[in-house]
């Protein structure tokens, strides 16, 4: 309440009673002032939710920090006393840190900071569009460069007046060349085989004639020697025996060689004429 200055008369100051009118005016003024100064109807104003949440979050953080300090001190003591429980304590510390992080995230979400972290959907779409444009630009440039290179190559071909051989044409030409070389080699082998067969047949025929002549000579020599001749003449010297053995060995070797060579030629796939020649030689 405020003190209201009042004007008093001289009689009041001297101790005499003031007049009644003066008292009435003073009382009226005081009542009006009291009415003016009286407070308006009081409404209880509750604190905002944000203020309460911030206070609660600060208190929870302080409690968490205090708990962490206590836990760290207890863990140090436990490590000094029981070093075997290190693994369990480390696991517990990791869980405490994870819980602390989750609680902090929840508090920031409650306080309303989540709108700063989470961008709007429109901004996300704009960012994606910008990224797509950035990625599409180099692709378009590469396609344009490829088209330009192809156009330059076509112009060069037209100007030169010929077409560059492709990989398929090169492969076909190589294959044709290999086939020609292979055919030529086969023809050469066939010619060589024919010549070799003819030479071998001639050699064998010459050897057979030589063997027949040698046999006739031996028979003539045997007929000239009479049975009444001396034992010395009838006895065969040891030098003559190996010569006879050598001649027979030569004939056998030649015949076996002919058989093996002709059989080998037949196995290679020669003509029917060669087979007939071989059969005729076998019957001789």
From Swiss-Prot:
Feature: compositional bias, Low complexity: 225-235
Chain segments carrying region Binds actin: 265-284
Tissue/organ expression: Highly expressed in adult and fetal brain. Expressed at intermediate levels in the lung and liver.
GO-annotated molecular function: actin filament binding
Positions of post-translational Phosphoserine modification: 73, 214, 226, 230, 233
Compositional bias (Acidic residues): 184-200
Chain residue ranges for the region called Disordered: 1-23, 110-251
PANTHER family for the chain: ERMIN
Function statement: Plays a role in cytoskeletal rearrangements during the late wrapping and/or compaction phases of myelinogenesis as well as in maintenance and stability of myelin sheath in the adult. May play an important role in late-stage oligodendroglia maturation, myelin/Ranvier node formation during CNS development, and in the maintenance and plasticity of related structures in the mature CNS.
Name listed for the protein in its UniProt record: Ermin
The species this protein was found in: Homo sapiens (Human)
Lineage start: Eukaryota, Metazoa, Chordata, Craniata, Vertebrata
Encoding gene, per UniProt annotation: ERMN
């Amino acid at each position: 309440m405020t003190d209201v200055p009042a004007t008093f008369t001289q009689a009041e100051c001297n101790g005499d009673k003031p007049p009644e009118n003066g008292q009435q005016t003073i009382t009226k003024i005081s009542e009006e002032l009291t009415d003016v100064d009286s407070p308006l109807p009081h409404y209880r104003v509750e604190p905002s939710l944000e203020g309460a949440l911030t206070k609660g979050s600060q208190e929870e953080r302080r409690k968490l920090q205090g708990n962490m300090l206590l836990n760290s001190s207890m863990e140090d003591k436990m490590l000094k006393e029981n070093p075997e429980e290190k693994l369990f304590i480390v696991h517990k510390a990791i869980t405490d840190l994870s819980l602390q992080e989750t609680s902090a995230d929840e508090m920031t979400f409650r306080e309303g900071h989540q709108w700063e972290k989470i961008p709007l959907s429109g901004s996300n779409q704009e960012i994606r569009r910008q990224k797509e444009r950035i990625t599409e630009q180099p692709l378009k440039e590469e396609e344009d460069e490829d088209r330009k290179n192809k156009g330059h190559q076509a112009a060069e071909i037209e100007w030169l007046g010929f077409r560059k051989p492709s990989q398929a044409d090169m492969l076909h030409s190589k294959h044709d060349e290999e086939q020609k070389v292979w055919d030529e080699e086969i023809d050469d082998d066939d010619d060589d085989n024919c010549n070799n067969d003819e030479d071998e047949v001639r050699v064998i025929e010459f050897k057979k004639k030589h063997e027949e002549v040698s046999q006739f000579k031996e028979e003539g020599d045997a007929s000239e020697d009479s049975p009444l001749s001396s034992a010395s003449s009838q006895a065969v010297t040891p030098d003559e025996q190996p010569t006879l053995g050598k001649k027979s060995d030569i004939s056998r070797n030649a015949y076996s060689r002919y058989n093996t060579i002709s059989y080998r030629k037949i196995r290679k796939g020669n003509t029917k004429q060669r087979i007939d020649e071989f059969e005729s030689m076998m019957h001789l």
